[in-house]
Amino acid sequence: MNQELIINNKHYKKADKLESLNMFKGQLYETIVTTQSNEHVKNAAPIGVICKDSNHIVIHLDNCVHTHLNIMENGELIVNITKDPLIFTYSTLGELDEEYFGQFNGFPMINDSLGFFKAHVVKTIEKKRENDYNDGIGNVVTCEVEDIYISDNNEIVPLNRAMNAVIESLVYYCRFDHKYKDIQKEIWTHMKELNRVCQKVGNESEKESMKLILDKLKKNHAYLE
């Protein structure tokens, strides 16, 4: 329990339960999951993580994402807790730049995470999810937690309203041409309202994130205003 870890001059202390990260049974948390292929090509993606108990999580994966392929290939992942909206945004809109990555025992993680844990797959169930990617075929994956570390200098706190607006907009972005293909105009109107809220109460990173999301959608859909 007293084991300490230093990554890029940031101090972490070891913990033994997910509750140490303020993650509790039955709750879903927005995280950044880092993985790597067997060829050591790293990837980061926003993934909702459900806390099953003190040492197990459940995640839903779709076949179209690198994260899914990597996890199914080698069964390893790190779940990173961060409040940085740009990390969520960049890892959704494209590939995360190298500067955002650190390493834990040779495995990619996110620099400056508030906390993180390594996990490995113990159970996989194929499941059809209506209106999702790849004709709805994906996997529900249960993972056992191996190592939990918490930053010494940061308290893990709930996300604010502007950050929640960024997360919600990223969900809409990912599903815009699939689940929401028949109601895109309505979703776009709602996203513009989320942007209004973010511009009013958000910090500069949150505001920039919203601009990136909306600009990318407008680039891909010329009819949006």
Mark where each language-model region is.
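Basic, polyanion-binding surface patches
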Residues: N2-F116, V122-E225
